[in-house]
Amino acid sequence: MAAGCCGVKKQKLSSSPPSGSGGGGDASSSSHCSGESQCRAGELGLGGAGTRLNGLGGLTGGGSGSGCTLSPPQGCGGGGGGIALSPPPSCGVGTLLSTPAAATSSSPSSSSAASSSSPGSRKMVVSAEMCCFCFDVLYCHLYGYQQPRTPRFTNEPYPLFVTWKIGRDKRLRGCIGTFSAMNLHSGLREYTLTSALKDSRFPPMTRDELPRLFCSVSLLTNFEDVCDYLDWEVGVHGIRIEFINEKGSKRTATYLPEVAKEQGWDHIQTIDSLLRKGGYKAPITNEFRKTIKLTRYRSEKMTLSYAEYLAHRQHHHFQNGIGHPLPPYNHYS
């Protein structure tokens, strides 16, 4: 079931802040990953299980998009519905919700992030190969090539987001994901194209934009229901809220862990932005905030620029037998 991180119809979730404001936009189906645009929740027409979310503040407009038929996932040069929120536990205690292969720490968002976390914690799952795979899937789609081979990285199920940014200022270009755990090979393949082509805040991506793109993959872990809506840490936790709007309808919305820190928001500003993103239009009072059901989570995140993708592809091109030519508009020495 699709869901935008701001959650509306079929509870789509969106996790990025609305564009042009420090507050929220309307909430709906897809999920964005950056703070620039609004995330409206709507239903996305791309097939596949999972709750679709916008991961960076705002709502991505509703309405089903034209479906994309994707062939089975295949790798790029290496490496391998609605959202049900449980009621908060008794105050003062967070309940850890089971997530597949949950990791203990979130990863840095830069492309140079190490693939292991702090000493003593488990090795991170997210990797540059996952971003490379997303680039390869998008490239093959835009140029009409057969989809690449199955990647070599793990195919364990995770809730995930794929985020695209563009240009030197890294403006948000698309961000959609799901809170439903999906096998990574099919999930990344699906949400690569959904976020690039079906984010209703933006027109579909074109070939000309490829050289300026940055791709981020976020794997969501460590979901915990908490009693206090302030019981989460800015820059560490992503948050997903469930609330009843002024019309008596249940709504959901989410921000990925990096959003509040990037926007310079404190807890209250983040919650209020998320309520607006989720479509709450009445005045926000402290009493209303206390009625929110909040789930906090962490993420592992990896970002890769197009230039880094090309370097990776060039290195692995022959040994991995990629069945389509390298991008024609960048020169190799």
UniProtKB/Swiss-Prot annotation:
Localization, UniProt: Nucleus
Keyword Nucleotidyltransferase: no
Record keywords, A-Z: Nucleus, Phosphoprotein
InterPro entries for the chain: AMMECR1, AMMECR1_dom_sf, AMMECR1_domain, AMMECR1_N
Domain AMMECR1: 119-313
Residues forming coiled coils: none
Pfam families registered for this protein in UniProt: AMMECR1
Domain of life: Eukaryota
Transmembrane segments: none
Segments of skewed composition (Low complexity): 27-37, 101-119
Residues with PTM Phosphoserine: S16
GO cellular component: a single term: nucleus
Major localization class: nucleus
Start and end residues of each stretch annotated as Disordered: 1-39, 101-120
The protein's name in its UniProt record: Nuclear protein AMMECR1
